Amino acid sequence: KFLPKIIKIKKNIDSDFLKKINNKYFDTDGNKENLKFILEVAKILKLKKNSLLRTLKKFKGLKYRQEIIFQSKKLTIINDSKATTFSSSVSLLKSLTNVHWIVGGQAKKGDKFLLSKKNCKNIKAYVFGTKRKFFTSKLKKLMEYESFLDLKSLIKKLLREIKSKKNIRHTTILFSPSAASFDNFKNFEERGKYFNKLIKKYINA
């Protein structure tokens, strides 16, 4: 039987333990926070460190929630279709460098993008969908952007663009729409599945 208890979470994770985990899923600020909580609970439950380490190494998270769907030396592709507001995308954007951010969908009324211009210098936005004017109006003074009618034409152009560049530093394609999916999809799962399908089709085209 477990009684209610307030758990004090450590500010920092042991860097050596983090290296041993060697899982890109825990590289983002949000998932590092989740990992801190996991480690504290593991201590209370007296879980064996080696067993915990094996599990964390293999952990992939839930589908369409900061899901790494492709990784190479030069490119990482993350499917974060679950992100339906600007705030749900910001923490991930702050954690990454050299980001091609795919954004668009049914915008939430009154939604604000609270990221400073300084934190946007390594981000380029690729805006898609019928509501793209809403997104470009919010982002145009903060970062470079391109606008597309649909997700398919965006993916084809973006992948061609990345492949054509030689000697570029590591790049991340982040699909974090910051909007509801109802303009073109039944839900965020269908949207995430469609994104994965497009990447699979055009990544080696």
Describe these PLM feature segments.
Residues 24-122:
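Nucleotide phosphate-binding/pyrophosphate-handling subdomain across enzymes
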Residues 1-8, 15, 19-22, 183-189:
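Flexible active-site lid/hinge loop adjacent to a nucleotide/diphosphate
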Residues 29, 110-170:
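C-terminal helical cap/extension that packs against the catalytic core
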Residues 1-2, 155-157, 193-205:
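Phosphate-binding loop of NTP-binding sites
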Residues 1-11, 101, 124-130:
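Short, hydrophobic beta-strand segments that form beta-sheet elements in well-ordered domains
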Residues 86, 110-111, 134-136, 181-185:
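Short active-site-adjacent structural elements
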Residues 173-178:
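Short beta-strands and strand-loop turn motifs
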Residues 45, 144-147, 184:
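A structural signal for short, well-ordered beta-strand elements
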